Amino acid sequence: MGLPVADFTLLLATTDEFCLLQPLRDRMKLVLRYEFYSDEELAIVLLHRITALRWSVDDVVLVHIAYRSRGTPRLALRLLQSCHRVARSVDDKTITAAHLHRACELEEIDDLGLGPNEQKYLRLLEAGPIRLNVVASMLALPTRTVSQVIEQFLLRAGLIAKDKSGLRELTAKGRDRVSNACQQTV
């Protein structure tokens, strides 16, 4: 006995297509893989949001928020919202670079958009290459979270690399980042 079902289109969105069952993946007619947004595209997204909400912002702030957002609109919009909260807390009508700086301080976000876990991850690798399970235990996070959430941007940004045996290590760019961060805190 069959059920009559009208024609329909099923849209799937995932960041890990291999978590889907093979029969479902086989039935996909079209697979699209999107790239991360550029800083310029993120600035446009932010400008649209600011216009829709009728907020006032210094133009330079948009560029700095976009740069800290890792190519991801939701991160850019979240940081914009944080800046707006900071501006409102001091009764300012315009979001300025000072508000962005304070929002980043409160959320412990550095100038590249790295949060506390990513910053700690980089400092752990300063001593030398480490296996994923060791990094995860030192961060008190599941290995899957470390590999899929924390490492994703660090690899894309060229701050870390994986060697043939699976050890995580800092790249030259990553070492520069850690040494510069240490100098700024001193």
Which stretches of residues belong to each language-model region?
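The conserved phosphate-sensing helix
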Residues: 58-59, 69-84, 94-96, 114-116, ...
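Conserved alpha/beta core segments of nucleic-acid transaction machinery
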Residues: 85-128
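Terminal-proximal interaction/regulatory segments of ATP-powered molecular machines
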Residues: 126-186
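C-terminal helical "lid" of AAA+/P-loop NTPase domains
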Residues: 62-68, 74-89, 120-124, 151-152
